Swiss-Prot record:
One of its GO terms (molecular function) is peptidase activity. ATPase subunit of a proteasome-like degradation complex; this subunit has chaperone activity. The binding of ATP and its subsequent hydrolysis by HslU are essential for unfolding of protein substrates subsequently hydrolyzed by HslV. HslU recognizes the N-terminal part of its protein substrates and unfolds these before they are guided to HslV for hydrolysis. The gene is hslU. GO terms for cellular component: HslUV protease complex. NCBIfam families: hslU (TIGR00390), PRK05201.1 (NF003544). A double ring-shaped homohexamer of HslV is capped on each side by a ring-shaped HslU homohexamer. The assembly of the HslU/HslV complex is dependent on binding of ATP. It comes from Thioalkalivibrio sulfidiphilus (strain HL-EbGR7). This is ATP-dependent protease ATPase subunit HslU. Keywords: ATP-binding, Chaperone, Cytoplasm, Nucleotide-binding, Stress response. ATP binds at V18, G60, V61, G62, K63, T64, E65, D258, E323, R395. It is found in: Cytoplasm. Its main location: cytoplasm. It comes from the Bacteria. Belongs to the ClpX chaperone family. HslU subfamily. GO terms for biological process: protein unfolding; proteolysis involved in protein catabolic process.
């Protein structure tokens, strides 16, 4: 669990996301409250439930990006799902309980990587010994009277090979090693609601013939990686890991529910809205707190934090069923992006768009320099196209940048030297498309 303060979390999010202070503060406080709850006495800790968040804002303003960055900062089981993927129980599609099963899988993967990292050094030493055993097999004795090889000589030779192995001199040499056989994956089609049975059957088929080994011929570089992973997995207690992962999900799990507005009832329409409302009703017990059966045991969802987000173009937050609204008490509104925000998006974040394109073309010897007036012109054009057609927020910048640099990207292998992207260059490449509204609808 991350112990970063709210201020540190916001500063970290500022490196990648422009603006949206309210949303950043809300998720930072929610994440810090997870840590605060862990410091409480056990009796009081059980009573403190997370305050779930609903983020409201147009598309392309940073809702999903906040979730992606939060996943890296949280150091806790985290999963991002689209509400549109799920259907009411009885309809064809995934049921909402699979969210918790996927969250447990994510927790086990996270914990396994952490535990394998702790034993990595010992695993590398064990893998090194196995490679040396293949390179220097123990000599066979021909008969009862034959003299065994001198131990000091053997040890000295082994140390020489160990030194060469660590220096990378043997990396390209091929050897044959015995490794655990990879279980064959079996795809099982099951009716809706039977995903858990399919998962158990897959585990059963994979365990058939478990413990078998196979001989593989690999370069020492690749063999070392494979053997290190195998030795590390052997050193980790899998049963304890599963118990800890389930406990981690129950206490620290975070679920990001994207596109929640797509399952809201739109006005007085009927038909497919029945299923939409059904998804909301199925989400209620998860958000409120219930017990979900997974292949690793029962998981209680009382203390899992849910962050929902949606654009709410065609519906309003009040179109969600009242019970679900009550379970998302913290509302955060994200503002639409302006031309000034676009300028900052193009230049300020770590690995900004201009930096990415410059680095890509630098690989071919083309040095692209974005002038300040050129960046501002790109931002103005993106804003104008958003206003005249559909407003897709910062995603419009990707479209504009691709169109702007299309010719340079195509001619890059034959063109060496600097290229300056200023306002005149941007106008030359894009102005005609922007002026022609019909054309800009299709191309930009």
């Amino acid at each position: 669990m991350s112990d970063m303060t709210p201020r540190e979390i916001v500063q970290e999010l500022d490196k990648h996301i422009v603006g949206q202070k309210d949303a950043k503060r809300a998720v930072a406080i929610a994440l810090r409250n997870r840590w605060r709850r862990q410091q409480l006495p056990e009796a009081l800790r059980q009573e403190v439930t997370p305050k779930n968040i609903l983020m409201i804002g147009p598309t392309g303003v940073g809702k999903t990006e906040i979730a992606r960055r939060l996943a890296r900062l949280a150091n806790a089981p985290f999963i991002k799902v689209e509400a549109t993927k799920f259907t009411e129980v009885g309809y064809v599609g995934r049921d909402v309980e699979s969210i918790i099963r996927d969250l447990v899988d994510a927790a086990i993967k996270l914990l396994r990587e952490q535990e394998m990292g702790k034993v990595r050094f010992r695993a590398e030493e064990a893998a090194e010994e196995r490679v040396l055993d293949v390179l220097l097999p123990a000599p066979r004795q021909a008969g009862f009277m034959s003299e065994p090889a001198s131990a000091p000589e053997q040890s000295e030779t082994r140390q020489k090979f160990r030194k060469r192995l660590r220096e990378g001199q043997l990396d390209d040499k091929e050897i044959e090693i015995q490794v655990s056989a990879t279980p064959v994956g079996v795809e099982i089609m099951t009716p809706p609601g039977m995903e858990e049975m399919a998962s158990q059957l897959q585990s059963l088929f994979q365990n058939i013939g478990g413990g078998r080994s196979q001989t593989r011929k690999l370069k020492i570089r690749d063999a070392m990686k494979l053997l290190t992973d195998e030795e590390a997995a052997r050193m980790v207690n899998q049963d304890e890991l599963k118990l800890r992962a389930v406990a981690n999900v129950e206490q620290n799990g975070i679920v990001f529910l994207d596109e929640i507005d797509k399952v809201a009832k739109r006005g007085e329409y009927g038909g497919a809205d029945v299923s939409r409302e059904g998804v909301q009703r199925d989400l209620l017990p998860l958000v409120e707190g219930c017990t979900v059966n997974t292949k690793f045991g029962m998981v209680r969802t009382d203390h899992i934090l849910f962050i929902a987000s949606g654009a709410f173009h065609l519906s309003k937050p009040s179109d969600l069923i009242p019970e679900l609204q009550g379970r998302l008490p913290i509302r955060v509104e994200l503002s639409a992006l302006t031309a000034e925000d676009f300028v900052r998006i193009l230049t300020e974040p770590d690995a900004s768009l201009t930096e990415q394109y410059s680095a890509l073309l630098q690989t071919e010897g083309v040095e692209v320099n974005f002038a300040e007036d050129g960046v501002r012109r790109i931002a103005e054009i993106a804003t104008r196209v958003n206003e005249r057609t559909e407003n897709i927020g910062a995603r419009r910048l990707h479209t504009v940048m691709e169109r702007l640099l299309e010719q340079i990207s195509f001619e890059a292998p034959d063109h060496q030297g600097p290229v300056s992207i200023d306002a005149a260059y941007v106008d030359e490449r894009l102005e005609e498309l922007v002026q022609d509204e019909d054309l800009s609808r299709y191309i930009l």
